[in-house]
Design a protein with these regions (language model features):
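Beta-rich, blade/repeat-based domains predominating
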Residues: 1-15, 50-68, 100-118, 149-166, ...
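Oxyanion-binding "anion nests"
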Residues: 72-84, 88-122
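Beta-propeller fold detector
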Residues: 40-49, 91-100, 144-150, 189-197
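Conserved beta-strand positions in repeat-built beta-propeller and related beta-rich domains
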Residues: 20-23, 63, 71-75, 123-127, ...
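Structural signal for beta-propeller blades
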Residues: 26-28, 77-79, 129-132, 175-177
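C-terminal hydrophobic structural anchor segments
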Residues: 133-181
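Intrinsically disordered, low-complexity linker/loop segments enriched in Gly/Pro
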Residues: 1-36
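Short loop/turn segments immediately following beta-strands, especially the blade-tip
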Residues: 31-41, 82-92, 134-142, 180-188
């Protein structure tokens, strides 16, 4: 299991649900969660979202406004786009699009985040031609690739600042965090600001409110 995410609250979905990408089994686990206030905590495995053999689903992101889920596969470098639907209050996931997240078949796709505006989707890629892939989110929730920006070595994790103006990239092998400005077209532009963390190697980055 590489990540655990709560499904955002949606009008047609009843209760609380957890999704967990299981890279080794090529599935995303769907788990029903009952909170302590409701008689829990109880976790019940409800089902799985299957992926192609060897794809390796790693991280997911949600667009609650459009009712979409995006899943980045580490091994195949593909981005799977799902529509989230309801079957009697239970979430169902309908595959809408599959695209190659980068152009390099590097086998090291890592992190994924949606811009606060909902207009752009970003993914990071390692092992060859390391960088960030940028996609435009269409009105129907599908994506259209916009470009690719190189980063320092091994961008394992990144975040978008809450104001949507900057991207901070944690480059594990470079032992640094690199700062990018996001221009009007959603493209990351290097600022030249790099925070060295040597001898530590950053593997995750987050802002705590």
């Amino acid at each position: 299991i590489h990540q655990v995410r709560f499904l955002p609250q949606m009008a047609d979905i009843q209760g609380s649900w957890i999704l967990a990408p299981d890279l080794g089994s090529d599935k995303v686990r769907v788990i029903k969660y009952i909170a302590p206030s409701e008689g829990g905590p109880v976790l019940t495995h409800s089902g799985d979202i299957p992926f192609p053999a060897g794809s390796g689903p790693r991280h997911i992101e949600f667009d609650s406004e459009r009712g979409m889920m995006y899943c980045l596969s580490e091994l195949s470098g593909e981005l799977f786009v799902f529509r989230i639907k309801s079957a009697d209050g239970v979430p169902m996931f309908e595959l809408a699009q599959t695209v190659l997240a980068d152009e390099f078949h590097s086998g090291g796709s890592a992190d994924i985040h949606l811009h606060p505006s909902g207009r752009y989707l970003y993914t990071s890629h390692r092992l060859k031609n390391d960088g960030l892939a940028v996609s435009r989110v269409c009105d129907d929730g599908t994506i259209r690739k916009c470009g690719y920006v190189h980063t320092k070595d091994h961008p394992r994790s990144f975040l978008i600042t809450p104001d949507g103006r900057h991207i901070l990239v944690a480059s594990k092998n470079d032992l640094s965090i690199e700062v990018f400005f996001i221009d009007g077209d959603g493209m990351p532009v290097p600022t030249g600001r790099i925070a060295s963390l040597s001898p530590d190697a950053p593997t995750a980055i987050a802002i705590c409110k």
